[in-house]
């Protein structure tokens, strides 16, 4: 077939030789140390050396990483879904020298097994057009505080943290153990002149998920039913005249208990535990302290093998709020039209 520039390349054309030879024949996998995975098959062993990356990187950084791959593993590496770098090493003698050089270049090795892996985050103030908070800044502050857990693998289970700078949540925050979500709290400020000059009114009305935006033919603009607005910012995507960002009222909510894994219990969505924390750059101390508090509570009380959400479900959400000291308010009650599906339907409570 002729080559076409459509979609990703066939992954089979880029596999390391050891992976091709062992494909479908792997015998077992083990973790010799935090940050290193060993995969064994009939044709030999492959070592995955995992180190963290800041996700938003420059060309020079990529060149340095590729130079390490050329030197120690024949140029074979990959980026994980959590923005870690994995060097695919087929020669065991190259593992330790690679780790030493990674550490020397400021690339910490870790994030495997029962640890806190790299934080998935969205664009934030760097690039997103509807952010309620920054993504890179909070990620840096939180992981600086939790860095010791990246290089250990003795936690109750793996812990996944995600950061989304707005409710669009392109950072998979809804299925992470701890999710940091930027939230807007005020309705968009309408610039009617900008709306009239540069907006398709039908598209703007149709984009609102709660039908809060209504056409205003008299003014050739729109109106907003404030009671229906959920502050998602989707309307700003359709019109530059719908200003959603508010430096005073925007902030961060914290959700916990989500997971994608189907092991032990079914996949689950995260649930909100802290409805609002202020934006205090550059280090976001309130957010960092809250995350550290939740992580320490989980480590101290969870059983071996329990994800954060599994631990909370075992002891009950009532007990979690009691242990954590986080106040339970009316903001925790889901008022979405279909939220009844998620409500507890029995009289069994856990205190």
Residue ranges and their predicted role:
Residues 9-16, 22-57, 120-124, 270-276:
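Short glycine-/aliphatic-rich beta-strand segments at the starts of folded cytosolic domains
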Residues 16-23, 49-199, 350-351:
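Small-residue-enriched alpha-helical segments and adjacent helix-cap loops
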Residues 74-81, 112-113, 152-158, 215, ...:
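Flexible, glycine/charged-enriched surface loops at secondary-structure junctions
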Residues 89, 93-101, 313-332, 337:
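Terminal amphipathic helices with adjacent charged low-complexity linkers/tails
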Residues 119-122, 160-167, 308-321, 341-342:
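A glycine-rich phosphate-binding loop feature that marks nucleotide/adenosyl-phosphate handling sites
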Residues 203-224, 228-253:
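Iron-sulfur cluster-binding cysteine motifs and their immediate structural context
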Residues 259-302:
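A hydrophobic, small-residue-rich beta->alpha segment in the mid-to-C-terminal subdomain
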Residues 284, 291, 297-306, 311, ...:
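Long, compositionally biased charged/polar accessory segments in the mid-to-C-terminal portions
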């Amino acid at each position: 077939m002729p080559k076409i520039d459509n979609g990703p390349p066939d992954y089979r054309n880029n596999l390391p030789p050891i992976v091709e030879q062992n494909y479908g024949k792997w015998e077992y996998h083990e973790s010799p140390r935090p940050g290193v995975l060993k995969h064994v098959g009939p044709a030999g062993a492959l070592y995955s050396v995992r180190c963290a990356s800041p996700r938003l990187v420059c060309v020079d950084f990529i060149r340095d990483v590729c130079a390490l791959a050329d030197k120690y593993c024949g140029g074979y590496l990959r980026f994980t879904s959590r923005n870690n770098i994995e060097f695919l090493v087929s020669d065991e003698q190259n593992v330790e020298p690679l780790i030493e050089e990674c550490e020397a270049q400021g690339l910490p090795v870790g994030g495997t097994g029962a640890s806190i892996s790299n934080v998935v985050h969205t664009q934030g103030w760097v690039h997103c057009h509807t952010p309620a908070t920054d993504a890179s800044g909070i990620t840096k502050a939180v992981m600086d505080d939790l860095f010791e857990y990246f290089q250990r693998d003795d936690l109750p289970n793996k812990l996944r943290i995600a950061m989304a700078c707005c409710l669009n949540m392109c950072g998979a925050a809804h299925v992470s153990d701890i999710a940091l979500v930027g939230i807007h709290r005020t309705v968009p400020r309408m610039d009617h002149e900008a709306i009239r000059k540069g907006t398709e009114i039908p598209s703007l009305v149709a984009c609102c998920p709660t039908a809060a935006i209504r056409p205003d033919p008299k003014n050739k603009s729109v109106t907003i039913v404030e009671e229906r607005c959920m502050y998602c910012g989707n309307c700003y995507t359709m019109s530059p005249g719908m200003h959603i960002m508010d430096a005073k009222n925007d902030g961060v909510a914290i959700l916990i208990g989500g997971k994608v894994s189907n092991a032990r219990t079914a996949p689950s969505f995260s649930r909100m535990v802290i409805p609002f924390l202020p934006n205090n750059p550059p280090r976001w101390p309130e957010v960092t302290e809250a995350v550290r508090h939740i992580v320490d509570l989980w480590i101290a009380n969870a059983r071996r093998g329990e994800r954060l959400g599994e631990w909370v479900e075992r002891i009950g959400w009532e007990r979690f709020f009691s242990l954590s000291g986080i106040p339970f308010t009316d903001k925790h009650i889901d008022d979405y039209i279909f939220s009844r599906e998620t409500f507890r339907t029995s009289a069994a409570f856990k205190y």
